[in-house]
Amino acid sequence: LICYVSXDXEXAAAPP
């Protein structure tokens, strides 16, 4: 969800 915080790779529903 929050890739810029979780480092989810690309992100899911989060801003770039």
From Swiss-Prot:
Keywords: Secreted. One of its GO terms (cellular component) is extracellular region. Expressed by the venom gland. The keyword Secreted applies. The keyword Secreted applies. This is Long neurotoxin F1. It is found in: Secreted. The lineage of its organism: Eukaryota, Metazoa, Chordata, Craniata, Vertebrata. Its main location: secreted.
